[in-house]
Swiss-Prot record:
InterPro entries: PurM-like_C_dom (IPR010918), PurM-like_C_sf (IPR036676), PurM-like_N (IPR016188), PurM-like_N_sf (IPR036921), PurM_cligase (IPR004733). Signal peptide: none annotated. Pathway: Purine metabolism; IMP biosynthesis via de novo pathway; 5-amino-1-(5-phospho-D-ribosyl)imidazole from N(2)-formyl-N(1)-(5-phospho-D-ribosyl)glycinamide: step 2/2. GO terms for biological process: 'de novo' IMP biosynthetic process; adenine biosynthetic process. Pfam families: AIRS, AIRS_C. It is found in: Cytoplasm. Belongs to the AIR synthase family. Disulfide bonds: none annotated. It is an enzyme of class 6 (ligase). One of its GO terms (cellular component) is cytosol. Its main location: cytoplasm. This is Phosphoribosylformylglycinamidine cyclo-ligase. GO terms for molecular function: ATP binding; phosphoribosylamine-glycine ligase activity; phosphoribosylformylglycinamidine cyclo-ligase activity.
Length: 345
């Protein structure tokens, strides 16, 4: 045994992992990709895309403590989708098309089979979003992490014509708020969820509470975050929307006000979309207030679009073409003096 392996770092396992993920990476290749996995840096040729005034838009994020659920369940092949979704949906919210993605995995012990499952999910998320997986890093850090632990983060870069970029100045009073449903909890609020389920209550991930209609708690919590690129990017390129809010950490209360200026107020009609059973369950056993829920969770909505009255029918028609479910949940109005930027009533 070499001295580095004695210290807890198995370089051979790293080589094994690279060989396992090569076909996964190759399956995400798209126009503009240069080189292949194994170089010191990933390369992408923007000229091939034919933009007139290109602006690059970057985003980075992780999966948070949802990873602890995946590790407890020994199910590691979906959290990579979450990682990509958290990044590319943010890039989309600026009006950009995701181009390429890089991942970072830190672990206590490099188990090539397990980490290849993680990258399998990353590659799937890249395919769903049209991103090329052009690089990544796996850092084996004994003593920093327990052998069964890993962390996952990602970095997305997208592109937009300068004139297509979305900013808060575009939204206007009278804009309709069109919401696209989430698939579940997505990747935020898991510290509160874990406290409610495992500290305040003795819930098992294998439990099947009546509210979840036959699904286990673990299965429900691990449902991957939705990726909205296919449904929404055409709306951006047709200049049909004024803003996109990705409902992530901080829920509605924090994220929706980011897409309009301080002189506007979002009035949300609670009950204008069907709730998801997982949120009813968490609210009940966690004894959570509405404020707790809307400050923490997506409450069944993953993305909100601000759309002018002139374009709302065209947006709905395009979403129907993509077989995308949507709900009209409210409007932007002039903000009364001294009032909050968002009201849920």
């Amino acid at each position: 045994m070499n001295r580095y392996k004695e210290a807890g770092v198995d370089v051979t396992a790293g080589y094994d992992l690279v060989n396992r993920i090569k076909p996964l990476v190759a399956a995400t290749k798209r126009k503009g990709v240069m080189g292949s996995i194994g170089s010191f840096g990933g390369m992408f040729d923007l000229e091939e895309l034919g933009y007139k005034h290109p602006v690059l838009v970057s985003g980075t994020d992780g999966v948070g403590t949802k990873l602890m659920i995946a590790q407890k369940m020994h199910k590691n092949d979906t959290v990579g989708i979450d990682c990509v979704a958290m990044c590319v949906n943010d890039v989309l919210a600026q009006g950009a098309e995701p181009l390429f993605f890089l991942d970072y995995i830190a672990c206590g012990h490099n188990d090539p089979e397990r980490l290849a499952d993680v990258v399998k999910g990353v590659a799937e998320g890249c395919k769903q979003s049209g991103s090329a997986l052009i690089g990544g890093e796996t850092a084996e850090m004994p003593d920093m992490y327990e052998p069964h632990e890993y962390d996952l983060a990602g970095f997305s870069t997208g592109i937009a014509e300068k004139e297509d970029l979305l900013s808060s100045s575009l939204a206007k009073a009278g804009d309709h708020l069109i919401a696209l449903p989430s698939s579940g909890v997505h990747s935020n609020g898991f510290s509160l969820i874990r406290k409610i389920l495992f500290k305040d209550h003795d819930v098992s991930l294998d439990d099947k509470p009546a509210e979840l209609s036959g699904k286990t708690v673990g299965e429900t919590l691990l449902t991957p975050t939705r990726i909205y690129i296919k449904a929404v990017l055409p709306l951006v390129k047709k200049h049909l929307i004024h803003g996109i809010a990705h409902i992530t950490g901080g829920g509605f209360i924090e994220n929706l006000p980011r897409i309009y200026d301080d002189n506007l107020q979002a009035v949300i009609n609670k009950g204008s979309w069907p709730g998801l059973p997982i949120f009813d369950y968490l609210k009940k056993i966690g004894v959570l207030s509405d404020q707790d829920c809307y400050n923490t969770f997506n409450m069944g909505i993953g993305l909100v679009l601000a759309v002018s009255s002139e374009n709302v029918d065209a947006v709905k028609e395009q979403l129907n073409t993509e077989n995308e479910e949507f709900y009209e949940i409210g409007k932007l109005t002039a903000r009364p003096a001294g009032k909050a930027k968002i009201v849920i009533e």
